[in-house]
Amino acid sequence: MATLRIRLQVPKKYRDQPLMGDVLASCQLQFNILAAHLGPNREEDGWFDVMLTGTSEDITAALAVLRDRDIELWSDTEDEF
């Protein structure tokens, strides 16, 4: 199993959708939200700090889906995912 800690910005257009759960569960990943800044009445985008656990292939697939939805991603790791 591989792990990857990422930070991501979720555009406010996804505020009322279960984006994180849907994408990460569909890629068979476990995820732990380490920190978040998001609320139903906020006008800004939301931010999450998450730890992903799964196969390298599943992590790569989830990151591709998130990028396709215009989610900005940051990671402190040198690993290529």
UniProtKB/Swiss-Prot annotation:
Alphabetically ordered keywords of this record: Sulfate transport, Transport
Gene3D superfamilies linked: 3.30.70.260
InterPro entries, sorted: ACT-like_dom_sf, NIL_domain
SUPFAM superfamilies tied to this protein: ACT-like
Highest rank taxon of the organism: Bacteria
Role of this protein: May have a regulatory function.
Record-stated family: To Synechocystis PCC 6803 ssr2439.
Protein name: Uncharacterized protein Synpcc7942_1683
Annotated organism of origin: Synechococcus elongatus (strain ATCC 33912 / PCC 7942 / FACHB-805)
